A protein has these predicted regions:
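Active-site loop segments of alpha/beta catalytic cores
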Residues: 1-113
Length: 113
C-alpha cells in the first residue's frame, strides 16, 4: 500500500514473529530488505539472505544483560550472517534502561570482527 501512495524510497519490512514465513515474505513483498526478530533461527536468516538483505536480530534483553552471553550472541550472529547482505541491529527496539557500556561492548565486538 505504501507504494500506491507514491513512496519510492527503499523499505525494510519487519514480519515480526513469522520466521516460518520469512522466505516467502522476502520473495513476495515489495521491500528491499527484511528485518528479523529475535526468535528467527540463524538458518532461516541465511536463507532469506539469498533473496534479500536482512537486518537484526540481537535480543534487547541480552543487550541489557551484557557480559559474556552478549558477546557469544554477537559472535553467533556475525558468524552466521556476517558475509551479508546484513545490517546488524536489534531484533526489536532498544530498552530505555540498557547501560551505555553494553552498547559500547557490542560496538567494540562488531568492530573487532
Amino acid at each position: 500500500r505504501v507504494r500506491d501512495l507514491g513512496v519510492t524510497v527503499p523499505l525494510i519490512g519487519f514480519p515480526r514473529g513469522s520466521a516460518a514465513l520469512a522466505e516467502r515474505y522476502a520473495s513476495e513483498c515489495d521491500v528491499q530488505a527484511v528485518a528479523l526478530d529475535t526468535a528467527c533461527p540463524l538458518a532461516v536468516g541465511q536463507r532469506v539472505q539469498a533473496i534479500k538483505p536482512i537486518q537484526g536480530a540481537l535480543d534487547p534483553l541480552l543487550l541489557r544483560a551484557g557480559g559474556a552471553a552478549l558477546d557469544r550472541r554477537v559472535d553467533q550472529l556475525v558468524e552466521a550472517w556476517g558475509a551479508g547482505p546484513w545490517i546488524f541491529n536489534l531484533g526489536h527496539g532498544i530498552l530505555p534502561d540498557v547501560p551505555i557500556a553494553h552498547v559500547e561492548q557490542v560496538l567494540k565486538r562488531i568492530g573487532a570482527q
